[in-house]
Amino acid sequence: MESSAKLTSVRLSPRKTRLVVDLVRGKVIQEALNTLRFLPQPSAKLVSKLLQSAVANAEQKGVSDVDALYVKTIYVDGGSVLKRFLPRAMGRASKIRKPTSHISVTLSDSK
């Protein structure tokens, strides 16, 4: 049985978040959570919370053995970009892009 969870409009760069997500793809859920626990990246904490949410969704669906779950698919899509301007010298302005991410995960209990 599969369960999924989504996290939308997270104020993290999709490029940096993909580095963390690639480390847990295909792993058993407990191993993935242990991997994320020791990563220094800010996105690791959010991905960990998302995995725990997907596990809770699986329990709600009636999965009996939660320890047998593994990360079937996990991916990061780019969200909307917040655009800001920074005043510069001589009346000019520089554009500042603040990217957002959408993270989706699917857990499954059968390989």
Swiss-Prot record:
GO molecular function per UniProt: rRNA binding; structural constituent of ribosome
Keyword terms of this UniProt record: Ribonucleoprotein, Ribosomal protein, RNA-binding, rRNA-binding
Record GO cellular component, one term: cytosolic large ribosomal subunit
One GO process term, biological-process aspect: translation
One Pfam entry name: Ribosomal_L22
CDD domains: Ribosomal_L22
Bilayer-spanning residue ranges: none
Quaternary data: Part of the 50S ribosomal subunit.
Task performed by this protein: This protein binds specifically to 23S rRNA; its binding is stimulated by other ribosomal proteins, e.g. L4, L17, and L20. It is important during the early stages of 50S assembly. It makes multiple contacts with different domains of the 23S rRNA in the assembled 50S subunit and ribosome. The globular domain of the protein is located near the polypeptide exit tunnel on the outside of the subunit, while an extended beta-hairpin is found that lines the wall of the exit tunnel in the center of the 70S ribosome.
NCBIfam families: rplV_bact
Name of the protein described by the UniProt record: Large ribosomal subunit protein uL22
Species this protein is from: Pelobacter propionicus (strain DSM 2379 / NBRC 103807 / OttBd1)
Annotated gene: rplV
